[in-house]
UniProtKB/Swiss-Prot annotation:
Disruption phenotype: Morpholino knockdown of the protein causes abnormal numbers of small, fused, and misplaced otoliths, and a smaller inner ear. Neuromasts of the morphants are smaller, and the number of lateral line neuromasts in the morphants is fewer than in the wild-type. Fewer hair cells per neuromast are found in both the anterior and posterior line of morpholino knockdown larvae (120 hpf) than in the wild-type. Knockdown larvae have a defective balance system, they show an abnormal swimming behavior by remaining stationary and resting in abnormal positions, they swim up and down and in circles. InterPro entries: Choline_transptr-like. It catalyses: choline(out) + n H(+)(in) = choline(in) + n H(+)(out); thiamine diphosphate(out) = thiamine diphosphate(in). Pfam families: Choline_transpo. It comes from Danio rerio (Zebrafish). The gene is slc44a4. The chain crosses the membrane at residues 37-57, 246-266, 270-290, 326-346, 375-395, 465-485, 517-537, 579-599, 616-636, 656-676. Belongs to the CTL (choline transporter-like) family. Residues 58-245, 291-325, 396-464, 538-578, 637-655 are extracellular. Its main location: membrane. One of its GO terms (cellular component) is plasma membrane. The lineage of its organism: Eukaryota, Metazoa, Chordata, Craniata, Vertebrata. This is Choline transporter-like protein 4. Residues 1-36, 267-269, 347-374, 486-516, 600-615, 677-723 are cytoplasmic.
Length: 723
């Protein structure tokens, strides 16, 4: 006992003196002043600047540049005068493939040096201009389709010959089967299209055979098509969401109900429910062991090995390999053994953790409104994310369109007089000014980047990201401080519930906004700076991954690991600092120091008790998310059939996307509800440590903790002497 007391005194001297008894202290201090005013002013200035950036982006930006394709004159397809023509057709897709950067195409809408027209639907077959069309008396209206030609050309009334129309690129002289990908008509030469029997005999590019023509088009446009096909996958996923959103919402509602029921059960039967939870996880592990063993034995006659299978994206193939189930079996056995050993050696600490959770449950029983606060945090985070996304989109589409004179076919006539930087106006452009170059056209190139606002778009995007991260971290900090103040009001109420303040959550929220915006912004700023460094490291690692030598890669890995650990540590310190701010109203640095010293003086209790509680709450999340995930899997994969035609799984492109969405949403919902519990446990634990240091159980300095906690710690309050 003497050695233990000596170690405690040494820790106290190293990490500050224990908290002293204060007869006037009975919970969160009401008489407080504003803290970290400089950081508060800085945060307000950043928010004001963020609003200005959003307004400028809204004034200069136009999301239609990304949402809708454009024809050669820069007019949007699918809206305005082209409302019934949602897709864009490229006369010579080969020019797009050779002259277009893929990333620029995705952002700028795939503008390339060939005529583009808006069409109602993409061509679905092969077609090439007949040789008869080149005869002197051939009429263009007999060979071209009006819909596929530029709108200014009227085939019935034109005086142009077929050759002149081709040279001026007023109509396409060939097209292939195309598919509308993001409303762009891109070649679809897969499957039976490669069969020469399905291709007209006259279909070929000049100087090439049919097979050479197909090969040239396929090879030249493969990268372009694949790039837009990836975006098309996103549209297919969006279609799945449109078909299943009602069922996704239903799954999320079930997750919310299960989470609330779990918390209500935890309030009344915390010990029983937690032990059931622990043994339930062990039972799930045991079932997994049995299942893996059963499948392992059922494949005893299989000769399939990993060397036979090789690498494949088909996961089902690996499940047919016997060694796969053996690996699963070994892993589950190890995990099960570790859990059983932890349960045996930490059983006493688990009892203390249960007591903390019971105390938190009692607090929630008196402050049920705290369970609704995650909704406030979610709404504020949704506002931050929406504002960031909309601002980023408008910034990316800022700038007036730039048109330049381009020779679409330099082999026809003398086009040397056309300068590369010669701009034009598509409304007033007259091709007769370039009589020596019949293919001269006024073509949209890109958007203006020469103005003051446009030159700083990259810097504004960086500002957008930094302000977004700061706002998100501030919202989270506000939630921590608000909940901490409410739970601290409960703990430091000596006679519960009589001494609990009225509307403790609202009072705590108002105190945080009135006095501690600067302190919360200070903590959020520190975390934001670390997150920015991590983002930069991830970018550099991705940018130079191929060029790095082993030493550089090792150094980069070490830096990423160190800053990841630093971010986790800062989050831990911030969380406890916000608790101290909510209780005592000090500035961020003082609160962080006091919280850190208090935790270090009780490091054993912190590591064991607090983390055991976190582990138990994580198991609760796992149970909720796992149950909802299994239900979603059986439903969206068609294993649970609904009567009638209410829902058909076959109508989905990727049935796993709704499953992932439900699981992810269920995790967010469970995390929101359990975060209240987690914050309550952390706050009560910190108050509990302060209670042990401030008080000794005497009549003058009684403990504020519950009788259950005092019983576990062999503590008790002495009754005041009477008479």
């Amino acid at each position: 006992m003497g050695k233990k007391k000596q170690e405690e005194e040494q820790n106290s001297s190293e990490y500050g003196a224990p908290a002293q008894y204060d007869p006037t202290f009975n919970g969160p201090i009401h008489k407080r002043s504003c803290t970290d005013i400089i950081c508060c002013v800085l945060f307000m200035l950043v928010i004001t600047g963020y609003m200005v950036v959003g307004i400028l982006a809204w004034l200069y930006g136009d999301p239609r540049h990304v949402l809708y394709p454009r024809n050669s004159t820069g007019m949007f397809c699918g809206i305005g005068q082209n409302q019934n023509k949602p897709s864009v057709l490229y006369f010579d897709i080969l020019k797009c493939a050779t002259a277009t950067n893929i990333m620029a195409a995705a952002l700028q809408g795939l503008q390339c040096p060939t005529t583009q027209v808006c069409v109602s639907s993409c061509p679905s077959g092969f077609w090439a201009l007949s040789p008869l069309a080149y005869l002197p008396n051939a009429k263009p209206a007999d060979y071209f389709q009006q819909e596929l030609c530029v709108p200014s050309l009227q085939l019935k009334d034109t005086t142009y010959t077929v050759m002149e129309i081709i040279n001026k690129e007023l109509c396409p002289y060939y097209y292939t089967p195309t598919t509308s990908v993001l409303d762009r008509c891109l070649p679809s030469l897969g499957g039976s299209a490669y069969n020469p029997s399905n291709i007209p005999a006259n279909f070929s590019l000049p100087g090439l055979s049919i097979n050479q023509t197909l090969s040239t088009i396929a090879n030249a446009t493969s990268d372009l098509t694949n790039s837009f096909n990836m975006k098309d996958v996103g549209l297919r996923i969006f279609e799945d969401f449109a078909k299943t959103w009602q069922w996704i919402v239903a799954g999320l509602v079930i997750a919310m109900v299960v989470s609330v029921l779990f918390l209500l059960l935890l309030r009344f039967t915390a010990p029983v429910l937690i032990w059931i939870l622990i043994f339930g996880v062990l039972a799930v592990g045991a079932f997994g062991i049995w299942y893996c063993y059963n499948d392992y034995m059922s494949l005893a006659s299989s000769n399939l090995t990993f060397s036979n299978v090789g690498f494949t994206t088909n996961v089902q193939v690996y499940l047919q390999v016997r060694d796969t189930w053996l690996a699963f079996l070994i892993i589950l056995c190890i995990v099960e053994a570790v859990l059983i050993l932890a349960l045996i050696f930490l059983r006493t600490r688990i009892l203390i953790a249960i007591a903390l959770i019971q105390e938190t449950s009692k607090a929630l029983g008196h402050m049920m409104s705290t369970l609704l606060y995650p909704v406030v945090t979610f709404v504020l985070l949704l506002v931050c994310v929406s504002y960031w996304g909309i601002t980023a989109l408008y910034l990316a589409t800022s700038g007036a369109p730039i048109y330049k004179v381009v020779a679409l076919n330099t082999t026809q006539g003398d086009c040397s007089n056309i300068q590369a930087n010669q701009t034009c106006d598509p409304q007033t452009f007259n091709s007769s000014r370039y009589s020596s170059c019949p293919s001269a056209r006024c073509v949209f190139i890109n958007y203006n980047t020469e103005g003051l606002f446009q030159r700083n778009l990259f810097n504004l995007q960086i500002y957008n990201v930094v302000a977004f991260l700061w706002c998100v971290n501030f919202v989270i900090a506000l939630g921590h401080c608000t909940l901490a103040g409410a739970f601290a009001s409960y703990y430091w109420a000596f006679s519960k519930p009589a001494d609990i303040p009225t509307f403790p959550l609202t009072q705590s929220f108002m105190r945080a906004l009135r006095y501690h915006v600067g302190s919360l912004a200070f903590g959020a700023l520190i975390l934001t700076l670390v997150q920015i460094v991590r983002i930069i490291l991830e970018y550099l690692d991705h940018k130079f991954k191929a060029a790095q030598n082993p030493c550089a890669r090792f150094l980069m890995c070490c830096l990423k690991c160190c800053f990841w650990c630093l971010e986790k540590f800062i989050k831990f310190i911030n969380r406890n600092a916000y608790i101290m701010i909510a209780i005592y109203g000090k500035n961020f640095c003082v609160s962080a120091k006091n919280a850190f010293f208090l935790l270090m003086r009780n490091i054993v209790r912190v590591v064991v008790l607090d983390k055991v509680t976190d582990l138990l709450l994580f198991f609760g999340k796992l149970l909720v998310v796992g149950g909802i995930g299994v239900l979603a899997f059986f439903f969206f994969s068609g294993r649970i059939q609904l009567p009638g035609n209410t829902f058909q799984t076959a109508a989905l492109n990727y049935y796993w996307m709704p499953i992932i969405t439900v699981v992810f949403g269920a995790y967010l919902i469970a995390h929101g509800f359990f975060s209240v519990y987690n914050m309550g446990v952390d706050t009560l634990f910190l108050c509990f440590l302060e209670d042990l240091e401030r008080n000794d159980g005497s009549a003058e300095k009684p403990y504020f903790m519950s009788k259950n906690l005092m019983k576990i710690l062999n503590k008790k309050n002495k009754q005041p002497k009477t008479g």
